[in-house]
Amino acid sequence: MTTLVHDEHPGLTHLQRLEADSIQIIREAVAESERPVMLYSIGKDSSVLLHLARKAFRPSRLPFPLLHVDTTWKFRAMYAFRDAVAAEPDLDLIVHRNPDCVAQGINPFDHGSALHTQMWKTEGLKQALDQHGFDLAFGGARRDEEKSRAKERVFSIRSAQHRWDPKRQRPELWRLYNASKRPGESVRVFPLSNWTELDIWQYIHREAIPLVPLYFAALRPVVERDGTLIMVDDDRMRLDPGEVPQERMVRFRTLGCYPLSGAIPSTATTVPEVVQEMLLTTSSERQGRIIDHDGSASMEKKKQEGYF
């Protein structure tokens, strides 16, 4: 018996298929929403997502703003990169900081990674979505990153309280997406769901997408804590007694708040060298994210509470 498989994009390469699918998702999401927004974390996935969105609506301006939920604890290089992107004429960037966190001085040292993430990121995101009335938010999450993200749909319905219920997910057959929602509900849309980390890097190489320099190896001051290399990025970093930062050749596979982001030893200083490194690696991309190591604050639990 011969099985016939319909190819929606005959003659396209793997990356071209991914690109075409993502652009279709972005356009459909905008068509089905009243007030969309794109979450912008300054990382490589956000940079690829922004690049795809521009392709989707070129030569027009983006029909939605970018939203950066700021924790005040990102790397200095990330803020410099964000400000450079925000200065581009076709973009509108909203920066939101949870005022409760500012007032209480929430930080990863005194309050721990779980509370820091819950207050700054989860509650901050919900505040921003409510304040601006956004009914659909694009995110750069991919299914290969983490098991709870692997089972989330491309169009993910959130309750009026921004909660995710895995049991209420809708079928998405033949790339047919359903963005309908009840009053008060919103939708999170993930156009990069089917991309892998290697796909992202190969696309960055093909499209010459600029990135935060932290993704490339350089001598940086780090301390090792529980097997994780933490970069000393500013004078807020609290060193343990006798702890002395050492200059090591490292880079980051994933970026977040600098006291909670682990670097990896690397000599990859260019995109082709990073791609080569990706072809040989056997470790998880998010192994350096300290927030993922907190069993009481698993990714699925955070997503159910309203996290990205």
From Swiss-Prot:
The lineage's top-level taxon is Bacteria
Q: Which SUPFAM superfamilies does the UniProt record give?
A: Adenine nucleotide alpha hydrolases-like (SSF52402)
Supply the Pfam families for this chain.
PAPS_reduct
InterPro entries, per the entry: PAPS_reduct_dom, Rossmann-like_a/b/a_fold, SO4_adenylTrfase_ssu, Sulfate_adenylyltrnsfr_sub2
This entry's Enzyme Commission designation comes to: 2.7.7.4
Task: Write the record's keywords in alphabetical order, separated by commas.
Answer: ATP-binding, Nucleotide-binding, Nucleotidyltransferase, Transferase
Reactions that this protein is recorded to catalyse: sulfate + ATP + H(+) = adenosine 5'-phosphosulfate + diphosphate
**Molecular-function GO terms, alphabetical:** ATP binding; sulfate adenylyltransferase (ATP) activity
Q: Which HAMAP family match?
A: Sulf_adenylyltr_sub2
How is the subunit organization of this protein annotated in UniProt?
A: Heterodimer composed of CysD, the smaller subunit, and CysN.
Q: Which family does it belong to?
A: Belongs to the PAPS reductase family. CysD subfamily.
**Stated role:** With CysN forms the ATP sulfurylase (ATPS) that catalyzes the adenylation of sulfate producing adenosine 5'-phosphosulfate (APS) and diphosphate, the first enzymatic step in sulfur assimilation pathway. APS synthesis involves the formation of a high-energy phosphoric-sulfuric acid anhydride bond driven by GTP hydrolysis by CysN coupled to ATP hydrolysis by CysD.
| PANTHER family with a match to the protein in the record | SULFATE ADENYLYLTRANSFERASE SUBUNIT 2
Q: What is this protein called?
A: Sulfate adenylyltransferase subunit 2
The gene from which this protein is expressed is: cysD
